[in-house]
């Protein structure tokens, strides 16, 4: 994969979300999700996982990539809510 300045890596996204969790900017959807707790975040993960599956079955590769990116986002929000680091997860790969 070639990288451009507008491409975000998994690690860069986690760093960005961690910073939002730490600084709590007004109007942040990430902060609102974290404040809503693990239950609400988990529901979003289930929703996004279903959308990934449906996109894989019925939509374009671009639509599938979009749905996967949303699932990765919500997975990272859940990691932050539970206090997991990337290393916690990478150690299980």
Swiss-Prot record:
The keyword Ribonucleoprotein is assigned to this record: no
Gene Ontology cellular-component annotations: cytoplasm
One GO term (biological process): L-histidine biosynthetic process
Pathway field: Amino-acid biosynthesis; L-histidine biosynthesis; L-histidine from 5-phospho-alpha-D-ribose 1-diphosphate: step 2/9
Catalytic function, reaction form: 1-(5-phospho-beta-D-ribosyl)-ATP + H2O = 1-(5-phospho-beta-D-ribosyl)-5'-AMP + diphosphate + H(+)
Keywords: Amino-acid biosynthesis, ATP-binding, Cytoplasm, Histidine biosynthesis, Hydrolase, Nucleotide-binding
Annotated localization: Cytoplasm
EC number, as in UniProt: 3.6.1.31
Short name of any one Pfam family annotated for the protein: PRA-PH
InterPro entries xref list: HisE, PRib-ATP_PPHydrolase-like
GO MF, one annotated term: ATP binding
Similarity annotation: Belongs to the PRA-PH family.
Name of the protein this chain belongs to: Phosphoribosyl-ATP pyrophosphatase
High-level lineage: Bacteria, Bacillati, Actinomycetota, Actinomycetes, Mycobacteriales
């Amino acid at each position: 994969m070639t990288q451009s300045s507008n491409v975000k890596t998994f690690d860069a996204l986690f760093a960005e979300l961690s910073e939002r969790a730490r600084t709590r900017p007004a109007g942040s959807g990430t902060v609102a999700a974290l404040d809503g707790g693990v239950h609400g975040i988990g529901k979003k993960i289930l929703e996004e996982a279903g959308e990934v599956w449906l996109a894989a079955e019925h939509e374009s590769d671009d639509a599938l990539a979009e749905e996967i990116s949303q699932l990765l986002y919500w997975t990272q929000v859940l990691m932050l809510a539970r206090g997991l680091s990337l290393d916690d997860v990478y150690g299980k790969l």
